[in-house]
A protein has these predicted regions:
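Membrane-embedded alpha-helical bundles of multi-pass transporters/translocases
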Residues: 1-176
Length: 177
């Protein structure tokens, strides 16, 4: 995605390349450690009762809001940007734990591999299409009414947030636990 290079050139432009690499690497490591420690607990919670959709919604909301909020983070605000990014990764990763746990609610045992593969592939296809659109926005900002590639990247974060929200709604409304 756009975050690493945009972080360095826009939000952390006042840091040296070494410092910005250190910041993003450290933050990613800390978020990864948090996820590694919390994932087994969250997985057990998902297996314990009918809370999968509630927690999926909560984590998705964290990710959706965080991703969209990146649009509003001002230039040179690297501390805020990296914090919001970390929350977004936690929202995405935590949501995936509960999303994966829902497979037993939406599919018969003999269909779970097919259902999981279909969901996985459609998710990546949709995400890939949006990423392609976002890359085109970056490469040709004028085509999309943007003044600069910077505006295009900022709008890309907002578009990902909206996309995530829109394509999460069918799950929240149509799938029962």
């Amino acid at each position: 995605g756009f975050f690493p290079f945009f972080f360095k050139s826009y939000w952390a432009a006042d840091l040296s390349p070494t410092e910005s690499t250190f910041v993003i690497g450290t933050a990613s490591s800390l978020v990864g450690l948090f996820i590694a420690i919390s994932a087994p607990v969250l997985g057990a919670l998902a297996d314990a009762g009918n809370v999968k959709k509630k927690f999926l919604f909560a984590f998705a909301a964290i990710g959706i809001v965080s991703t969209g909020y990146l649009f509003f983070v001002p230039e040179s605000s690297w501390k805020l940007a990296i914090t919001i990014y970390g929350l977004g990764v936690i929202g995405f990763s935590g949501g995936n734990i509960f999303y994966d746990a829902l497979i037993i609610s939406v599919s018969k045992p003999e269909d779970r591999n097919k259902t999981s593969s279909l969901g996985f592939s459609l998710g990546y296809l949709g995400g890939g299409l949006l990423f392609f659109l976002n890359v085109m926005m970056y490469l040709y900002p004028g085509w999309f009414g943007f003044n600069s590639p910077i505006d295009a990247v900022l709008w890309s974060f907002l578009s990902v947030s909206v996309w995530w929200f829109v394509f999460s709604m069918p799950l929240f409304y149509a799938i029962s636990e």
